[in-house]
Each structure stands twice: as C-alpha cells, then as structure tokens.
Design a protein with these regions (language model features):
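Conserved substrate/cofactor phosphate-moiety recognition/catalytic segment
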Residues: 1
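Flexible active-site lid/hinge loop adjacent to a nucleotide/diphosphate
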Residues: 4-112, 165
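Adenine nucleotide phosphate-binding catalytic loops in nucleotide-utilizing enzymes
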Residues: 77-167
Length: 167
C-alpha cells in the first residue's frame, strides 16, 4: 500500500505494479502545488493510463473524481456516502460547482462536504453513480468517533469509526 502525491503518481504508475487505485476526492488544497484543479485531475488521469489492469475505487460523491472513470478500460468500484454528513454543509463553498462536461451548475439531492454529495447536472445528465460500498446511515457522530451503517454490495454492517467528524 502506497499513498502517492498526485503529480508523483503520474510517473510512479509507470513503474509500480498497481493492482488497485483509490481516489478519494479532488479539492483545491492541491493548488499550492499544481496551480489548478484541472492540473491535479489530469495528473491522476495520466497515471491511470499506465495501469489499465488496475481496479479503480472511486468516490461517487466527487464529480471530479467520478470523471476519472470515463474512457478507460479499468474496472471501477464506486464508494460513497448516501446521506448528508453535516446538517450545516454549505454548498456555496464548492470547489466544483459546475458540470465538468457542459458547465451547467450542479443540482444536489444532498451535500456531504464542499462539492461532495448527490450531484447531478440538469442539462447533460452527468451525475453521481450508485456506489456498491456506501454509508447508508449515521447512527452517532461524536467528537472522537462515529457509528455508521455501511452497505457493501447489499449487505449492511454496523461499523464503529474511531475518527472524529465526517472522516
């Protein structure tokens, strides 16, 4: 298991025998290194071209991450959160408010954080994929831990997460 910087992944993927790639999300926090979100996205996309046999585990809640599944031969496994994490989530803080394809503003059934959530474009139809691994309920959300219901391919599990907040 290797956690790799987005820009380094572009090159590292040429030399490592990658079996599985997990991409959680793409946020503007990479701007100090890459200048713009599209550069980060393109670095990951280029790296994926070197690993056509790897399984991609992609966050269905992130419109940018989800776009990585387009025009690739890789098998994709989707994960996500099917319910709002925060009742006060502010969509206006979005790093990606507009459709990556047609530039129409996304509509959301719910927002989990920033631009993550149940997004869809009312113009071209691009939208969140149905995840096979998903948080379906948040039972408790404490300062130190949370209890959730996790659905994995149709089977539900009660899970205690030893992390604070929406992690």
């Amino acid at each position: 298991l290797i956690e790799c910087d987005e820009a380094a992944f572009r090159k590292a993927s040429e030399f490592l025998p990658v079996e599985c790639l997990v991409v959680n999300n793409i946020f503007r926090d990479q701007l100090d290194r890459y200048g713009e979100i599209t550069h980060t996205l393109n670095a990951i996309r280029e790296g994926i071209t070197h690993i056509p046999d790897a399984v991609l585990c992609l966050n269905a809640d992130c419109s940018l991450t989800a776009s990585l599944a387009e025009k690739i031969p890789n098998r994709v496994v989707w994960f996500g959160v099917n319910v709002p994490i925060y009742t006060h989530a502010a969509h206006e803080l979005s790093d990606a408010p507009y459709c990556i394809h047609c530039k129409t503003e996304y509509q959301y059934d719910y927002v989990t954080y920033g631009h993550l959530g149940g997004f869809h474009c009312p113009n071209c139809g691009y939208g969140r994929k149905t995840p096979s691994i998903a948080v379906t309920q948040i039972l408790t959300a404490g300062a130190d831990a949370s209890d959730i219901v996790l659905d994995i391919c149709g089977r539900e599990y009660d899970v205690h997460v030893n992390l604070p907040g929406g992690y």
